[in-house]
């Protein structure tokens, strides 16, 4: 469980998890390396990709000697959780709450971040053993929803994802977020098309700087 604790701390310390979605398997390592070079240490490969387990394993191998932690997102059920963990995922995220996924993660000693929106879902997730709560889609409720959850439930760890940008990330941290998830606001997809890895790095670095400013 010491490794699980370290991974959770890395996610929180990083402040932002890069969501790598819709990226070709041939580009995934280059993108992950560029994002990591930009200062992101928590990297999520979404499990809705056709070759997701291969991609997770490739990224895990490529960043093995760094401070990066590699996880899987969009993990909807227990079989998918088992598959991505076997591929090397150190943390698992989902847009939904499936207690079976939480159970698999706890059994395997892997950080679990299920998706929640309501106090009932948040309470169920924490009771099941979730490590962090993914507020998704955060854009539909905004930063104030974090306080609305923490008011009755106490200081539950919330990670808003969906619509988080450099413009609003400070508001989410001020509201009590422990970290955020970011996709297109952090990952420069146009630069990926051009194979301009320096631009991908710089886009990630800009988001990391916004997170650091928000937390300072």
Where are the model-predicted features located?
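Histidine/lysine/aspartate-rich catalytic loop segments that bind and position anionic ligands
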Residues: 95-141
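Glycine-rich phosphate-binding active-site loops on the catalytic face of alpha/beta enzymes
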Residues: 92-101, 136-143, 175-198, 206
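Generic structural signal for hydrophobic
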Residues: 34-35, 59, 84, 105, ...
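Structural preference for beta-strand elements that scaffold enzyme active sites
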Residues: 15-17, 42-44, 67-71, 90-91, ...
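C-terminal binding/interaction regions
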Residues: 153
């Amino acid at each position: 469980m010491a490794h699980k604790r370290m991974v959770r701390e890395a996610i929180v310390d990083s402040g932002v998890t890069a969501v790598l979605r819709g990226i070709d398997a041939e580009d995934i390592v280059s993108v992950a390396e560029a994002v990591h070079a930009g200062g992101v240490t928590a990297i999520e490969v979404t499990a809705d990709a056709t070759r997701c387990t291969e991609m997770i394993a490739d990224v895990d191998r490529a960043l093995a000697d760094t401070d990066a932690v590699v996880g899987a997102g969009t993990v909807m059920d227990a079989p998918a959780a088992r598959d991505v963990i076997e591929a090397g995922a150190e943390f698992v995220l989902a847009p939904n709450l499936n207690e079976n996924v939480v159970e698999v993660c706890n059994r395997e000693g892997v950080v679990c971040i299920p998706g929640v929106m309501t106090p009932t879902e948040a309470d169920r997730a924490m009771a099941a053993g979730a490590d962090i709560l993914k507020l998704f889609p955060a854009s539909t409720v905004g930063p104030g929803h974090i306080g609305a959850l923490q008011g009755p439930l106490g200081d539950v760890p919330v990670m808003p994802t969906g619509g988080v940008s450099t413009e609003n990330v400070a508001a989410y941290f001020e509201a009590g977020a422990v970290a955020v998830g970011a996709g297109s606001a952090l990952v420069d997809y146009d630069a990926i098309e051009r194979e301009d890895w320096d631009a991908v790095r710089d886009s990630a670095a800009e988001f990391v700087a916004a997170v650091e400013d928000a937390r300072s």
